[in-house]
Structures are given as structure tokens and as C-alpha cells.
């Protein structure tokens, strides 16, 4: 009798690998893990695994093996997503090299209408949706979205789709119009895009998820006198004589509050 232990568990123990156990990470733990993975640490060594496990334990029970297998599975998902993106890019390149995309019925249309913005609008929106929330790829003409910090959690892309579709529709409606109307339309699209951006973002301060405003923040009013903010890499964030940071914090990054020595 093996006392209820499976052969896989014995094999993992014999190979020196961590023993897998069932674990359902909490949302706070997922945020921390995704932030670390997207920062470039995709295969942490043993000492880093222990450090990450201690950080996660603030939000619930977790073992070193859970952290090890989470990164293993996350790397597999990332490679699978990368292959899907490469296949989509190859298909798009093949369609572009073969000329205008085939339509359901292009007969009866005058030459030049088959490739009009109306027929390309669907392809543009589909492409933007396919590229959303990828930590390894970004849409060239748009700023990064919140979803890019969350890996497989598909929160990003909505603002990009809306901006792209409104730009296409403006081109269709204003074809042949004056340059002043085109400039006004572009200004309106920019206002629409920035109005969709949240006023706050989530960072980790001393391991706790914290909502902070975008842009430079006032350290003294938020955290008190004689405090400094240090990035998880050990770099001190510069502030002026009034305690206001010179640069904005970065979404999903980890920081630590340090008391200034007198």
C-alpha cells in the first residue's frame, strides 16, 4: 500500500520537483503573480519563489509548489497565445499580399468599392480584438491599456476598438470633406479616447493593492511626513521639496514606503 499517494506524486518527489497540490489563488494573489510575470520574471529561481510565496501568504495560504506550477502553467499559456498571434499575423499578411479580401458578393459594385472603408471596417475591429490584452504584443497606433498588465484577463482593447471604429466611420462620413473638418473629427476622437481612461490605477504598496491617482502624487498628504517611496527594484522615486513625486507610478508595479531617517 502506498498510503493513498499517487505514482505521479512519488515520481515528482523522486525527481526533486515540488509536489503539486490543489490551489485556487485569490484575486489579490493573481494580481501579484501577473505583475511579476509581466515584469519579465517568467521562471523565478528557488529563492525568488520563496520570496513570492511569502508575499502571497498575506492574502491566503499558499505553498512553494503552488507558485512553481503557476509560473509553469502561465508560461505554457503565454507560448500558446504567442502561436495564435503569429498564426493570425501570417493569415493577415497572406490576405494583404493577395490583394483585396474576398467579399460575400462583390458583383455589381463599381471598381474601387470592394476595398472601401466599409468593407475593411470589420477586419480592423476583428484584428484589434485579436490583439487585445497580450503582454507580448501591442497595437502599434494606440497607447497600452490596463489589460496588458493582466495577461490572460481580457480587459484591454475596448478603448482601442472604439477609437479605431470611430476613426473609420469618420473617414467614411467625411470622405472628400475639408481638412478643417478632418482635424475637428480627430480632436473629437482624441477627447473620446481620453475620457475612457480611468482616473486612478492600482499599484502594490508594501504588498497591499492600493488605488492611486494617475500622474505625480503628493506623498505627504497621502502617507504622512518624512516618508519615501522605493520601487521593488530598490530604486528611490525622486520627489521635490514639497513631497510631490516627479513622475507617475506605474500600473501594477510594487513599491515600499520607507521612513526618512532624521
From Swiss-Prot:
Taxonomically, the superkingdom here is: Eukaryota
Keyword check for Transcription: yes
- Induction, per UniProt: Induced by auxin.
Point to the regions of Low complexity compositional bias. Answer: 84-112
Q: Where in the cell is it found?
A: Nucleus
Residues in the DNA-binding region annotation? 18-82
Q: Does the keyword Transcription regulation apply?
A: yes
Q: Where is this region: Disordered?
A: 1-21, 79-115
Any other comment in the entry?
A: Overexpression of WOX11 stimulates ectopic crown root development.
PANTHER family in the record: WUSCHEL-RELATED HOMEOBOX 11
Tell me what this protein is called.
WUSCHEL-related homeobox 11
Organism from which the protein derives: Oryza sativa subsp. japonica
Its lineage reads:
Eukaryota, Viridiplantae, Streptophyta, Embryophyta, Tracheophyta
Amino acid at each position: 500500500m502506498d498510503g493513498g499517494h499517487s505514482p505521479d506524486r512519488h515520481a515528482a518527489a523522486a525527481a526533486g520537483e515540488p509536489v503539486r497540490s490543489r490551489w485556487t489563488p485569490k484575486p489579490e494573489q493573481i494580481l501579484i503573480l501577473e505583475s511579476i510575470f509581466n515584469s519579465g520574471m517568467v521562471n523565478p529561481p528557488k529563492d525568488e519563489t520563496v520570496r513570492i510565496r511569502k508575499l502571497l501568504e498575506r492574502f491566503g495560504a499558499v505553498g512553494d509548489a503552488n507558485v512553481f506550477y503557476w509560473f509553469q502553467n502561465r508560461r505554457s499559456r503565454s507560448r500558446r497565445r504567442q502561436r495564435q498571434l503569429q498564426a493570425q499575423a501570417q493569415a493577415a499578411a497572406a490576405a494583404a499580399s493577395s490583394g483585396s479580401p474576398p467579399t460575400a458578393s462583390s458583383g455589381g459594385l463599381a471598381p474601387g468599392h470592394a476595398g472601401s472603408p466599409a468593407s475593411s471596417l470589420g477586419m480592423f475591429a476583428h484584428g484589434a480584438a485579436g490583439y487585445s490584452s497580450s503582454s507580448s504584443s501591442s497595437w502599434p497606433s494606440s497607447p497600452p491599456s490596463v489589460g496588458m498588465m493582466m495577461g490572460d484577463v481580457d480587459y484591454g482593447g475596448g478603448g482601442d476598438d472604439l477609437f479605431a471604429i470611430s476613426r473609420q466611420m469618420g473617414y467614411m462620413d467625411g470622405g472628400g470633406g475639408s481638412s478643417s473638418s478632418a482635424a475637428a473629427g480627430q480632436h473629437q476622437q482624441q477627447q473620446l479616447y481620453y475620457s475612457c481612461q480611468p482616473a486612478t490605477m492600482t499599484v502594490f504598496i508594501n504588498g497591499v493593492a492600493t488605488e492611486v491617482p494617475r500622474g505625480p502624487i503628493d506623498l505627504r498628504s497621502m502617507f504622512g511626513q518624512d516618508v519615501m517611496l522605493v520601487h521593488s527594484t530598490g530604486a528611490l522615486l525622486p520627489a521635490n521639496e514639497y513631497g510631490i513625486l516627479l513622475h507617475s507610478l506605474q500600473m501594477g508595479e510594487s513599491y515600499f514606503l520607507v521612513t526618512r531617517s532624521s
